[in-house]
């Protein structure tokens, strides 16, 4: 089976990055990227929600609720019929370390979609009452992920299927994004949405990224179709999506979140809406709950900028795993997890990284200085907790 190695492919686009960053990535957009680093898995069967609820960090129960219970109105061209937005979640080891991340989607059922005229509900033919969910997952660990899920399945009535050939993952991001929460079935008779839904019983549409508004829109679409609005946007390589995430300090997949090692709270999974503290037990829940209620997360994933002594950006290749130290003393402050050109991100000691007097550098490359960047989306208490030692994670 074809496998896309994102670590290897990213190295090809360093030149693209150099040109992009100096033209102002923060002002670029809108852009759309097909995410070759991601794949799609389908879950179906009466035990789908129960099965995932016992495994994942987020509360999956809302996918089992009938949309009719929430909204009894007949869908109209001015009323979106899709009521379940996507969800971000993770599967952990029993010790509470990161294994895999998931973007979960609930497709529109046929009776929840408008007909082709946009004037009424579609046919409910083929509905068998079972729950169906799709997951956008890391392609590099797909086979391992499927084996792990099937190991946990036991007697659960849930089918787990690789549908990578049928569907692709996409992201829309950057500045000046046009509204797209109503694109597709149930969001009005939009010709771009119709062209994508045509011949596709699922009627996929764009959704706001469940992690952060600044990340844009995300969804999965049939592999043989162009998603709505992509033709109007600039379709660009996935490396630019990595750059966008580096700007905001958001990691994704096992290439950036070390499998079996990373502590989800240090990778800001609470702020990324990936963890529910009200759902009850799941695999690895004990460590997450204990760490959260202890109150202080001293290390977090932080955006980094690599510069010289004059503050000029350095487009040098910084390897993942490189240590960031305090200049002069050599005290370790953190570790680079991902880097491309002059930008990166790493798990750092928050208090030390953001000290005004902090002088950081890459270990054994003292000419490469490191600047920690405060993400605009971070809640104020994340900065305060390391000063007071009492704020919640």
Curated annotation (Swiss-Prot):
Localization per Swiss-Prot or TrEMBL: Mitochondrion
Q: Name one Pfam family in it.
A: Beta-barrel_CAF17_C
**Range of the transit peptide:** 1-70
Recorded GO molecular functions are: transferase activity
| Tissues in which the UniProt entry reports expression | Expressed in flowers, siliques and seeds (at protein level).
GO cellular component terms, semicolon-separated: cytosol; mitochondrial matrix
Q: What is seen without this gene?
A: Embryonic lethality when homozygous.
Q: What is its EC number?
A: 2.1.-.-
Main location (coarse class): mitochondrion
The protein's matches in InterPro entries, at most eight in alphabetical order, are given as:
TrmE/GcvT_dom1, YgfZ/GcvT, YgfZ/GcvT_CS
Per UniProt, the keywords (alphabetical) are: Mitochondrion, Transferase, Transit peptide
Give, as one word, the top-level EC class: transferase
Q: Which family does it belong to?
A: Belongs to the GcvT family.
Which PANTHER family does the annotation name? TRANSFERASE CAF17, MITOCHONDRIAL-RELATED
Its protein name is Putative transferase At4g12130, mitochondrial
């Amino acid at each position: 089976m074809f496998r896309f190695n994102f670590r290897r492919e990213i190295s090809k686009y360093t030149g693209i990055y150099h040109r992009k960053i100096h033209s102002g990535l923060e002002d670029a957009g809108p852009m759309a990227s097909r995410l070759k680093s991601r794949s799609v898995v389908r879950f179906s069967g009466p035990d789908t929600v129960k099965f995932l609820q016992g495994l994942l960090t987020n509360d999956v129960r809302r996918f089992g609720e009938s949309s009719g219970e929430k909204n009894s109105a007949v869908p109209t061209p001015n009323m979106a019929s899709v009521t379940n937005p996507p969800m971000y979640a993770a599967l952990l080891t029993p010790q509470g370390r990161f294994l895999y991340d998931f973007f979960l989607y609930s497709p529109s059922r046929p009776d929840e979609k408008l007909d082709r005229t946009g004037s009424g509900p579609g046919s409910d033919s083929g509905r068998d009452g079972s729950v169906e969910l799709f997951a956008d997952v890391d392609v590099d660990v797909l086979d391992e992920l499927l084996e792990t899920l099937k190991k946990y399945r036991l007697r659960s009535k849930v089918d787990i299927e690789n549908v990578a050939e049928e569907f692709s993952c996409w992201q829309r991001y950057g500045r000046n994004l046009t509204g797209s929460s109503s694109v597709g079935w149930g969001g009005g008779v939009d010709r771009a949405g119709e062209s994508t839904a045509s011949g596709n019983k699922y009627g996929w549409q764009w959704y706001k990224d469940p992690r952060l508004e600044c990340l844009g829109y995300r969804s999965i679409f049939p592999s043989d179709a162009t998603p709505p609005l992509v033709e109007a946007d600039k379709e660009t390589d996935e490396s630019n999506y990595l750059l966008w995430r580096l700007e905001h300090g958001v990691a994704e997949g096992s290439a950036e979140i070390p499998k079996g090692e990373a502590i989800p709270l240090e990778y800001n999974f609470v702020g990324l809406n990936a963890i529910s503290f009200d759902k009850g037990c799941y695999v690895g829940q004990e460590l997450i709950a204990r760490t959260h209620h202890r109150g202080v997360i001293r290390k977090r994933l932080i955006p980094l900028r690599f510069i010289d002594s004059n503050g000029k950006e350095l487009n040098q290749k910084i390897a993942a795993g490189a240590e960031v130290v305090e200049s002069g003393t050599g005290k370790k402050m953190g570790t680079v997890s991902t880097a491309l050109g002059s930008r990166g991100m790493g798990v750092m000691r928050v208090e030390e990284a953001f000290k005004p007097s902090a002088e950081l550098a890459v270990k054994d490359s003292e000419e490469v200085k490191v600047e920690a960047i405060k993400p605009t989306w971070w809640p104020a208490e994340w900065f305060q907790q390391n000063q007071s030692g009492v704020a919640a994670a």
